């Protein structure tokens, strides 16, 4: 019996590693930052890459520093975006070894997949424009005719290249015939990856710089650039809040994802989807991937998700005072510096019981 339990445990671990394989690369922040990325052998030595991604790594070594940067940005942006929620994305720091909140097809994993997918393409697209990559350059000049008073110029983000390379990297584990995991899980992961990239594409906007005597802006040079990651993450957060729970069922001659509650319609390409309902994240429960909200900072005057009532799940909160030092009474002196005094201020903080 002990041997059987051991084998079952190993199978579950293997299955979990495949289920969340497409975001294991977020673990590259642990050891990828110390790699010079000048030898293909580095690719197989790193935690966080499944075999298909290791092959892509070997063929595209010059991209890997951008991939590491994307992993850092995705983890940081996720935690900033959810800092006011019970689930605050802190578990993403465990990459490449995830807890159930990110390994079981939850609403939270849907967000992280989408954000990671958008971030890697965003980072590569901007690396092209900044001249960091030898294999790409500025984005193509838009085909649309420029409007009155501006011309196309500058160096736009290379979204086309970013999407191609980013999708190849994050989608590889689900498209491999050798990968484990259920067909339903592969489908929702690919779907949520695509949602992330679509939000990224929708963020492409025209950016301009003025030219003219004394800043008159008689002529503007414009290019296509992506909005910053916090904007993209907030768009995805809105989709997270309205995500659709789905089931995998036979529809005609093939199996499809359909909304569990509204299975009369297909899943929309623009919505995040998930398979497993999440806990309320109020109490610590490692089996569910919940860290709980004890000792979390809350906002006494807020009526949102960071309010002490919601954040603390009705358990109440403790108050304490803290003295902070900040700049004050600043004066500008010609030319050209600012001098400030240092002032102390006492603030009241609140933490959940």
Curated annotation (Swiss-Prot):
Quaternary organization: Homodimer. Secreted homodimers form a complex with wnt5a homodimers; tyrosine sulfation of both wnt11 and wnt5a by tpst1 is required for this interaction. Interacts with the transmembrane receptor fzd7/fz7. Interacts with lrp6 and ryk. Interacts with tdgf1/frl1. Interacts weakly with frzb1 and strongly with frzb2/crescent. Interaction with frzb2/crescent antagonizes wnt11 function in the neuroectoderm, but enhances it in mesodermal tissue.
UniProt subcellular location: Secreted, Extracellular space, Extracellular matrix
Keywords of this entry: Developmental protein, Disulfide bond, Extracellular matrix, Gastrulation, Glycoprotein, Lipoprotein, Secreted, Signal, Sulfation, Wnt signaling pathway
Gene3D superfamilies: 3.30.2460.20
This protein's encoding gene: wnt11b-2
Annotated lipid attachment (O-palmitoleoyl serine): 214
The UniProt record lists the keyword Secreted: yes
Alphabetical GO biological process terms: gastrulation; Wnt signaling pathway
Any single GO CC term annotated in Swiss-Prot or TrEMBL for this entry: extracellular region
Post-translational modification: Glycosylation is required for protein secretion. Palmitoleoylation is required for efficient binding to frizzled receptors. Depalmitoleoylation leads to Wnt signaling pathway inhibition.
Positions annotated as glycosylated: 31, 38, 88, 299
Main location as per UniProt: secreted
Family classification: Belongs to the Wnt family.
Keyword Disulfide bond attributed: yes
Function according to Swiss-Prot or TrEMBL: Ligand for the frizzled7 transmembrane receptor. Primarily acts via non-canonical Wnt pathways mediated by either Ca(2+) and PKC, or by JNK and dvl2/dsh. Depending on the cellular context, can also signal via the canonical Wnt pathway mediated by beta-catenin and dvl2/dsh. May also inhibit canonical Wnt signaling. Maternally initiates dorsal/ventral axis formation by a canonical route, which signals via lrp6. In a complex with wnt5a, activates the canonical and non-canonical processes involved in axis formation.
Cleavable signal peptide: 1-22
Disulfide bridge map: 78-89, 128-136, 138-155, 208-222, 210-217, 282-313, 298-308, 312-352, 328-343, 330-340, 335-336
Protein name per its UniProtKB record: Protein Wnt-11b-2
Lineage of source species: Eukaryota, Metazoa, Chordata, Craniata, Vertebrata
Miscellaneous information on this protein: Xenopus and other lower vertebrates contain duplicated wnt11 genes (wnt11 and wnt11b) resulting from an ancient gene duplication event, but the second copy has since been lost in mammals. In addition, X.tropicalis has two very similar wnt11b genes suggesting a further recent duplication event.
Gene Ontology MF: a single term: signaling receptor binding
